[in-house]
Amino acid sequence: VYIDVESREKLLEIEVKGAVPAGKRFDSFVMTCEENGFTSLQRRRGINLIWEGMLPKVDFYPVPSLTLFAHDGRCGYFAHGGKGLESPIYFVSEKLECWYLAENFRTFVQMVVFEPDWKEKITGEKAVFEESHEELADFGMLFGLSSSDEKLSEKIHVESNYKIFENIEKAREKMSLR
């Protein structure tokens, strides 16, 4: 049994034995005027955080539930499994595929900063970045991060535990949604 989180504001009060939350939620950020790591992430890597009061209209419907926190400006969304930014980070592509990206937000940012070609594995498009090691190190310092000894993007894979439907109606056709 799946419970639609989009129509239930107080999901935690719902007690359905064995029910799995489905749908999407949003983690939004407070916009500031100053340049910080997150504005650099947007400018340099095309990762646009979802700002408070500016929630996007998103039609796709994930099962189980995902919490969206950013988009790529091209119909792709970044999300976590609903337990905050310490939980695994996923990417929902415009082809409605769910990709596992990293074990948590910190590791995700580390990968995006130091491996700017990480998205090639998902899109197949060649990324071109001309940043020196010093520029990458400075970028990482905005988040208190340094380069990893392992290639973090090698862990990217299609996540089979999530199904992404075109919309809630398509999900209802295929799943047992309440």
PLM feature spans:
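A surface-exposed partner-binding patch
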Residues: 1-85, 144-178
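Generic preference for well-ordered secondary structure
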Residues: 53, 89-96, 136, 152
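Short, flexible coil/linker segments at or flanking structured domains
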Residues: 55-57, 93-96, 131, 156
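Alpha-helix initiation/capping motif
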Residues: 80, 110, 137-138, 164
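Compact, glycine/acidic-enriched structural inserts
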Residues: 89-128
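An amphipathic alpha-helical core segment
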Residues: 113-155
